[in-house]
Swiss-Prot record:
Quaternary structure and partners: Heterodimer with STAT1 upon IFN-alpha/beta induced phosphorylation. The heterodimer STAT1:STAT2 forms the interferon-stimulated gene factor 3 complex (ISGF3) with IRF9; interacts with IRF9 in the cytoplasm. Interacts with CRSP2 and CRSP6. Can form a homodimer upon IFN-alpha induced phosphorylation. Interacts with IFNAR1; the interaction requires the phosphorylation of IFNAR1 at 'Tyr-466'. Interacts with IFNAR2; the interaction is direct. Interacts with ARL2BP. Interacts with E3 ubiquitin ligase DCST1; the interaction results in STAT2 ubiquitin-mediated proteasomal degradation.
Protein name: Signal transducer and activator of transcription 2
Alphabetized GO MF terms: DNA-binding transcription factor activity; DNA-binding transcription factor activity, RNA polymerase II-specific; identical protein binding; RNA polymerase II cis-regulatory region sequence-specific DNA binding; ubiquitin-like protein ligase binding
Outcome, altering residue 690 to F: Reduces phosphorylation of STAT1 in response to IFN-ALPHA
Taxonomic lineage: Eukaryota, Metazoa, Chordata, Craniata, Vertebrata
Biological function: Signal transducer and activator of transcription that mediates signaling by type I interferons (IFN-alpha and IFN-beta). Following type I IFN binding to cell surface receptors, Jak kinases (TYK2 and JAK1) are activated, leading to tyrosine phosphorylation of STAT1 and STAT2. The phosphorylated STATs dimerize, associate with IRF9/ISGF3G to form a complex termed ISGF3 transcription factor, that enters the nucleus. ISGF3 binds to the IFN stimulated response element (ISRE) to activate the transcription of interferon stimulated genes, which drive the cell in an antiviral state.
Protein's cellular compartments: Cytoplasm; Nucleus
Recorded family membership: Belongs to the transcription factor STAT family.
Stretches for region Interaction with heartland virus NSs: 316-575
Length: 851
């Protein structure tokens, strides 16, 4: 819906404002309405505010041409007499602006601004009243373009009809001219004079029709130019969206609609080009002095050809940027020797029936003159041919699926070396495509380029290479600037923050909220930063160590992203992981909650680690906050985080293990928060011969710690410490996660059901791993073994002979009763049922976090 059409649908108060606006305007309302689409399509802002007066002058004369054309159309309709009069009057009224066309541009530009202001006021009023909002011009552009295409097709049909009538008129003239030439009689012959008069009238009518056809072709070309001016910005929008999508922005960037529009526009231009050729032929058959077709057709044809070439050149695009199949989430990174894919497309879907189109690919057509800049060759075939049959069925699409790059050797032997000012991951390379396009006699070489790619030689460089891709596509205004990292610009947080969130939303499904982004902002710029939109340098993003973990910021963040994707995706997407929380914020959150409240946050001191912190309130009103040593992917590969949380044990003062993790922040019971992620629960009614084994995590609490808990500093002192020294790693519980298996306690049917619910033995950890198949028990009488003297009295009747094989690695005397020993979700087919494994002891005391 055009802006003027939306204004007509406004309520009375806003309609009154519109009438008042045009009551003092030189532009009449009826002309504003009749030329609404054309007026709104022109760039009045550039003409009014630009420093180049030529744009205002050109727009002024285009306006006059449009008025004259519309006036000519109205002259054929008797009912449009009033409109025709107003068009002519306005055309005369604006003649004085020929001396200063900028004034006319300013007048219309200000009118459009006032219209938009009235429209915005009306939309706000509708929002306050709860009414549906009017459709904005941006949302209606698709309808606008399609409507224009329909109008152009109608104009084209009319032009075809006019040319047909012109041919008939020219045939009449030729016939009369030949008759006149044959019957040569004295000039005083009345009949001859009459014939000459008729011939002259026929020539005058022919000249008139030629001018009308030429004017119609000019008007059609003007409308086509406007259509192309609408389509090309749409294509630029798509390219900008594609660039952002390459760095994982959530944007839909399909090309099907653009292909339909570009093809329709090209068809109209090619058709007009053919009609101009017909007019040229008519001019060659019959030519006379001041023939409008003699120069007019050549001029129109040149304009059409130029517009077609411009459209075709822009219509050849890279639809899918280069990407390796093994890293689909990180395009624009290529590895030497590895295959990658890329797709090009011509949006003008017109191909000769007998012409195949071949695209050639090359790399670094115009490489930068930098010392040490690497050079590459395309190892596989650098051509792709599209037959007419495939082009008609799938479109003009060239899929390169097996391209491979190899580095050129420098000197006589060995690989090329990179000793220039740029690192390997800062070199930018451009892959180019060329196709020789031919259609209806028009031949043109079309070229297009990919976005700059980073070429690595080892997958260990993938992370920092992605940082380069992210930085370039976020900040570079020039997509061909291969020397971007010679002097990389700083990134404003307003751009960088959303881009970091895109990495999570695209790769794991959920982006970063405002609190998480705020933590990252403080980590990069400090809590004292008061700048509204601070700037971050490339070195600070990827190279400079970031306290407290002594890791570059991007390395730290990318390792977390990898950890979440591989092991924590469901927990992250469901909001169970708070994640990016500073230690000071962690303390502020937990100290106000009940004992046992915990949260999950990413460690700031390890590469890809997640830790669990919980609060304990002492009897003397002291608050202690503990953090477990971070779990990395090596740990989580053996035991899911949800199972660690479920079965985590902390030894109390009486040396009895208990789980201190009771409520997920703010107050969600642990099993309610994580129950849906637990492994399959065990049927407690099932009778088993052996106790299942499972991995659990247990931390020791030292006696002196229990007797003398550390007192947390008051909040002001804490904040002062942060401002002066920065955050330092908190004391954490060191965990050695090691699965310990115990096999084959033959308890007998009498004691088994009792011990399943009461016995949970704990043994001293050891690196020894034993797996022993235990035979089925004999169904005959069982002799009573002599009990071990160190066993508890309630276990001395057990047969411990089959357990001798564990004597070197298991201390039976440390087995302790502690609840149900069965771990849910175990496979009962091929595992050895053993007693519950021991805790994983810590290599240091459990200390409260300083923050």
């Amino acid at each position: 819906m055009a802006q003027w059409e939306m204004l007509q649908n406004l309520d009375s108060p806003f309609q009154d404002q519109l009438h008042q606006l045009y009551s003092h305007s030189l532009l009449p309302v009826d002309i504003r309405q009749y030329l609404a689409v054309w007026i709104e399509d022109q760039n009045w802002q550039e003409a009014a505010l630009g420093s180049d007066d030529s744009k205002a002058t050109m727009l002024f004369f285009h306006f006059l041409d449009q008025l004259n054309y519309e006036c000519g159309r109205c002259s054929q309709d008797p009912e449009s007499l009033l409109l025709q009069h107003n068009l002519r009057k306005f055309c005369r009224d604006i003649q004085p602006f020929s001396q200063d066309p900028t004034q006319l541009a300013e007048m219309i530009f200000n009118l459009l601004l006032e219209e938009k202001r009235i429209l915005i006021q009306a939309q706000r009023a509708q929002l306050e009243q709860g009414e549906p909002v009017l459709e904005t011009p941006v949302e209606s552009q698709q309808h606008e373009i399609e409507s224009r295409i329909l109008d152009l097709r109608a104009m084209m049909e009319k032009l075809v009809k006019s040319i047909s009538q012109l041919k008939d008129q020219q045939d009449v003239f030729c016939f009369r001219y030949k008759i006149q030439a044959k019957g040569k009689t004295p000039s005083l012959d009345p009949h001859q004079t009459k014939e000459q008069k008729i011939l002259q009238e026929t020539l005058n009518e022919l000249d008139k029709r030629r001018k009308e056809v030429l004017d119609a072709s000019k008007a059609l070309l003007g409308r086509l130019t406007t259509l192309i001016e609408l389509l090309l910005p749409k294509l630029e929008e798509w390219k900008a969206q594609q660039q952002k999508a390459c760095i994982r922005a959530p944007i839909d960037h399909g090309l099907e609609q653009l292909e339909t529009w570009f093809t329709a526009g090209a068809k109209l231009l090619f058709h007009l080009r053919q009609l101009l050729k017909e007019l040229k032929g008519l001019s060659c058959l019959v030519s006379y002095q001041d023939d409008p077709l003699t120069k007019g057709v050549d001029l129109r044809n040149a304009q059409v050809t130029e517009l077609l070439q411009r459209l075709l050149h822009r219509a050849f695009v890279v639809e899918t940027q280069p990407c390796m199949p093994q890293t689909p989430h990180r395009p624009l990174i290529l590895k030497t020797g590895s295959k990658f894919t890329v797709r090009t497309r011509l949006l003008v879907r017109l191909q000769e029936g007998n012409e195949s189109l071949t695209v050639e690919v090359s790399i670094d057509r115009n490489p930068p003159q930098l010392q040490g800049f690497r050079k590459f060759n395309i190892l596989t075939s650098n051509q792709k041919t599209l037959t007419p049959e495939k082009g008609q069925s799938q479109g003009l699409i060239w899929d390169f699926g097996y391209l491979t790059l190899v580095e050129q050797r420098s000197g006589g032997s060995g690989k090329g070396s990179n000793k220039g000012p740029l690192g390997v991951t800062e070199e930018l390379h451009i892959i180019s495509f060329t196709v020789k396009y031919t259609y209806q006699g028009l031949k043109q070489e079309l070229k297009t380029d990919t976005l700059p790619v980073v070429i690595i030689s080892n997958m260990n460089q993938l992370s920092i290479a992605w940082a380069s891709v992210l930085w370039f596509n976020l900040l570079s205004p020039n997509l061909q600037n291969q020397q971007f990292f010679s002097n990389p610009p700083k990134a404003p947080w307003s751009l960088l923050g959303p881009a970091l969130s895109w990495q999570f939303s695209s790769y794991v499904g959920r982006g970063l909220n405002s609190d998480q982004l705020s933590m990252l902002r403080n980590k990069l710029f400090g809590q004292n930063c008061r700048t509204e939109d601070p700037l971050l340098s490339w070195a600070d993003f990827t190279k400079r160590e970031s306290p407290p973990g002594k890791l570059p910021f991007w390395t730290w963040l990318d390792k977390i992203l990898e950890l979440v994707h591989d092991h924590l995706k469901d927990l992250w997407n469901d909001g169970r992981i708070m994640g990016f929380v500073s230690r000071s914020q962690e303390r502020r959150l937990l100290k106000k909650t009940m004992s046992g409240t915990f949260l999950l946050r990413f460690s700031e001191s390890s590469e890809g680690g997640i830790t669990c912190s919980w609060v304990e309130h002492q009897d003397d009103d002291k608050v202690l906050i503990y953090s477990v040593q971070p779990y990395t992917k090596e740990v989580l590969q053996s035991l899911p985080l949800t199972e660690i949380i479920r079965h985590y044990q902390l030894l109390t003062e009486e040396n009895i293990p208990e789980n201190p993790l009771r409520f997920l922040y703010p107050r969600i019971p642990r099993d309610e928060a994580f129950g849906c992620y637990y492994q399959e629960k065990v049927n407690l009614q099932e009778r088993r011969k052996y106790l299942k084994h499972r991995l659990i995590v247990v931390s020791n609490r030292q006696v002196d710690e229990l007797q003398q808990p550390l007192e947390l500093k008051p909040e002001p002192e804490l904040e002062s410490l942060e401002l002066e020294l920065g955050l330092v790693p908190e004391p954490e519980l060191s965990l050695d996660l090691e699965p310990l298996l115990k096999a084959g306690l033959d308890l007998g049917p009498e004691l088994e059901s009792v011990l399943e619910s009461t016995l949970e033995p704990v043994i001293e950890p050891t690196l020894c791993m034993v797996s022993q198949t235990v035979p089925e028990p004999d169904q005959g009488p069982v002799s009573q073994p002599v009990p071990e003297p160190d066993l508890p009295c309630d276990l001395r009747h057990l047969n411990t002979e089959p357990m001798e094989i564990f004597r070197n690695c298991v201390k039976i005397e440390e087995i302790m009763p502690n609840g149900d020993p069965l771990l849910a979700g175990q496979n009962t087919v091929d595992e050895v049922y053993v007693s519950r494994p021991s805790h994983f002891y810590t290599d240091g005391p459990l200390m409260p976090s300083d923050f």
